[in-house]
Swiss-Prot record:
<protein>
    <recommendedName>
        <fullName>Potassium channel toxin alpha-KTx 30.3</fullName>
    </recommendedName>
</protein>
<keyword id="KW-0528">Neurotoxin</keyword>
<keyword id="KW-0800">Toxin</keyword>
<feature type="disulfide bond">
    <location>
        <begin position="40"/>
        <end position="57"/>
    </location>
</feature>
<feature type="signal peptide">
    <location>
        <begin position="1"/>
        <end position="24"/>
    </location>
</feature>
<keyword id="KW-0632">Potassium channel impairing toxin</keyword>
<dbReference type="GO" id="GO:0005576">
    <property type="term" value="C:extracellular region"/>
</dbReference>
<keyword id="KW-0872">Ion channel impairing toxin</keyword>
<keyword id="KW-1220">Voltage-gated potassium channel impairing toxin</keyword>
<feature type="disulfide bond">
    <location>
        <begin position="36"/>
        <end position="55"/>
    </location>
</feature>
<keyword id="KW-0732">Signal</keyword>
<dbReference type="GO" id="GO:0015459">
    <property type="term" value="F:potassium channel regulator activity"/>
</dbReference>
<keyword id="KW-0964">Secreted</keyword>
<feature type="disulfide bond">
    <location>
        <begin position="30"/>
        <end position="50"/>
    </location>
</feature>
<comment type="similarity">
    <text>Belongs to the short scorpion toxin superfamily. Potassium channel inhibitor family. Alpha-KTx 30 subfamily.</text>
</comment>
<comment type="function">
    <text>inhibits Kv1.3/KCNA3 channel.</text>
</comment>
<dbReference type="GO" id="GO:0090729">
    <property type="term" value="F:toxin activity"/>
</dbReference>
Amino acid sequence: MNKTFFLVVIMATVLVLAFDATDAQTNVRCTNTRDCFSFCSQFTNVHPACLGDYCECLRWEGGISI
């Protein structure tokens, strides 16, 4: 059972990283947060941020970023 658990954890991690990398290809490059306002305007209840030279639209719920 221990081997199965670790295999499932590894497979789930690989899937999360693969989908995260795919999503990152659609992001817009930025130099500051103001560049991200128009990109994030397509979403509701988000806060634009320029993180790692790319626009991120952060949604805060209960103090946890999703």
